[in-house]
Amino acid sequence: MPNTNITIHPRAIVHPNAKIGEGTSIGADAIVDEFVEIGDRCEIRARAIVTGHTKLGNDNQVGYGAIIGSEPQDTSYKGAVTFVEIGDRNIFREYATVNRGTKEGSVTKIGNDNLLFTGAHVAHNCKIGNRVILVNNVLLAGYVEVNDYAFMGGDSVVHQFTRIGSYAMVRGQTRLGMDVPPYCMAVDTNMVLGLNRLGLRRNGFSHERRRQILAAYDVIYRSGRNRSQALQFLESSAEFAENPDIQLFCNFIKASSRGICKLYERGASRIEEDRE
């Protein structure tokens, strides 16, 4: 640790072989282990632990009691060298946890500008994109993928190998074992209810872009076509075929191995779908 502008609390435990970037601070009772690399201007708050072969980029904040890089919670894990790779400008709030990969050389990856609230858990081999928000106590099982700009409400839980599409929103306490297509609102158990219209507006999607995405959503979920027929229609239609938003939507659905969430239908008690 040749840099001199690093602030390390006297009660912190930092291995001499750890690589710590310029301007980084490490709080009281924090632990930074031997194979850790921390970029510039990071803040490792009191009682946080960064362990394993973990690499953090620049300007990250690891909150009080958070644990990054711990062993996977997987009975097949036998001590293989595995990794956590984290980009820049991420915030891990109190007691968030990120496990490293399971199989030799495998990686848990988190991109840039993400926010993980208190108690959020990212299991082994997950992949999180950019500008994702995981609210309090979101639980991601192994190999889950959460794509860019997705928002996951508190206490939502995701089965292993499930994918959450870009710009999707998962309502609090939702249970997922099937993929959530891009732009959609996931509710209940493996169901969608319209688009994440608020998220789309906040991320600069024009009314026309939202209208076209909604039309494609209707083809998939409301046209009466089966999945392959709906995809064929979208990919051959002049209105949709060259639209990059629709291409993202279709490609995600085609790549699904677990199947995509179904349309929410509960008769008179159904949640109201806002189609603005």
What are these regions (language model features)?
Residues 1-11, 16-17, 22-23, 59, ...:
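Terminal amphipathic alpha-helical/low-complexity segments used for targeting or macromolecular assembly
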Residues 2-187, 191:
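Structural signal for interior beta-strand "rungs" in well-ordered beta-sheet cores
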